[in-house]
């Protein structure tokens, strides 16, 4: 009987520990800046968004697209670049990681994921003017 109680107590402690540790082990949806920096480059352009219809498809860098990730497509910035996207109308901003190519429509500078568009307030407009701040280029290997 004592042995069973010990095993039950150990199992309960293990389950509680897993619920405490598991959230800490979750992978981030975007890389964070390695250090606080001023933008390398700043410019203004139009942003559009792409979302759930693209979920599960491969991006240009080979990752699987997730509309809830903090990612974006840009025509020529290196994959892994970190860009702060600022809605010029509202001042809302989000840090994104470039993992895809596009947009392919003239006059558009960046395509952001659905999550980013939602946070910036771009969903209903579809296309909005944004300020792009290149914060970090990927490390060369």
Where does each model-flagged region fall?
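Secreted/periplasmic proteins
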Residues: 2-141
